[in-house]
Amino acid sequence: MEAPPPPPPLPATTLAPGRSRKLLLLPLLLFLLRAEAVRGFEAEERPRTREEECHFYAGGQVYPGEVSRVSVAEHSLHLSKAKISKPAPYWEGTAVINGEFKELKLTDYRGKYLVFFFYPLDFTFVCPTEIIAFGDRIDEFRSINTEVVACSVDSQFTHLAWINTPRRQGGLGSINIPLLADLNHQISKDYGVYLEDSGHTLRGLFIIDDKGILRQITLNDLPVGRSVDETLRLVQAFQYTDKHGEVCPAGWKPGSETIIPDPAGKLKYFDKLN
């Protein structure tokens, strides 16, 4: 008995080279997508470490080099109304002054220089060091007709609770400068320091002169505090130029040489310098 003939061969199908490569890559792509989804799920489910909780409590990642840090391009800063050599944006609100709630406004300081600075949040880390440093040296500012006001997006009630917390526990204790509440964020937005994505401000510092004109702006990223010595120096320099009409070179301090702002005057300065 003869064996049955073999079945006819199936017609060959030829895939285009491009389509063939796509089909080969499809399982790999599906695997990578599934792995990414699992990692994302695990990240959401994993409890925060103590360090991460501190960062979250402070309003975001605040140390250099962190991969999860929000990039500058993703920050949403409001258009600032604060312009150098123009009237400072008006503000008013409730502040804690000597343990009491009082209404405070920018015009209360007309006739004096004002150091007006923003800090991110109460009960954090760098912020109390700045407020205490300025508060402990308020007499040096007042001796040159200058006042200091600190502001954050916290309420006056949170401010008071922080003041009533001992310094050894991270509180402020008794302080000599007002803490202004900006609960609706309007002041922070007007001064261009409010981070919409984080819900708090950058470390902004503004020097306003005795006529209400904005003379200086400093904006620090979150991890680094500001210098009381440098702020005092800047106020003294602006006051000197207001009174004498001369200009202050780099690093100028009271008693140092200044420059008469004309061609002959500058030559006298550079001749002494060199």
Swiss-Prot record:
It catalyses: a hydroperoxide + [thioredoxin]-dithiol = an alcohol + [thioredoxin]-disulfide + H2O. The keyword Transport does not apply. Residues 1-40 form the signal peptide. The active site is at 127 (cysteine sulfenic acid (-soh) intermediate). PROSITE patterns: THIOREDOXIN_2. Keywords: Antioxidant, Cytoplasm, Disulfide bond, Endoplasmic reticulum, Oxidoreductase, Peroxidase, Redox-active center, Signal. It holds the Pfam family AhpC-TSA. One of its GO terms (molecular function) is thioredoxin peroxidase activity. One of its GO terms (biological process) is hydrogen peroxide catabolic process. It is found in: Cytoplasm; Endoplasmic reticulum. Its EC number is 1.11.1.24. Residues 82-240 form the Thioredoxin domain. One of its GO terms (cellular component) is endoplasmic reticulum. The enzyme can be inactivated by further oxidation of the cysteine sulfenic acid (C(P)-SOH) to sulphinic acid (C(P)-SO2H) and sulphonic acid (C(P)-SO3H) instead of its condensation to a disulfide bond. Gene3D superfamilies: Glutaredoxin. The active site is a conserved redox-active cysteine residue, the peroxidatic cysteine (C(P)), which makes the nucleophilic attack on the peroxide substrate. The peroxide oxidizes the C(P)-SH to cysteine sulfenic acid (C(P)-SOH), which then reacts with another cysteine residue, the resolving cysteine (C(R)), to form a disulfide bridge. The disulfide is subsequently reduced by an appropriate electron donor to complete the catalytic cycle. In this typical 2-Cys peroxiredoxin, C(R) is provided by the other dimeric subunit to form an intersubunit disulfide. Homodimer; disulfide-linked, upon oxidation. 5 homodimers assemble to form a ring-like decamer. Thiol-specific peroxidase that catalyzes the reduction of hydrogen peroxide and organic hydroperoxides to water and alcohols, respectively. Plays a role in cell protection against oxidative stress by detoxifying peroxides and as sensor of hydrogen peroxide-mediated signaling events. Regulates the activation of NF-kappa-B in the cytosol by a modulation of I-kappa-B-alpha phosphorylation. Belongs to the peroxiredoxin family. AhpC/Prx1 subfamily. This is Peroxiredoxin-4.
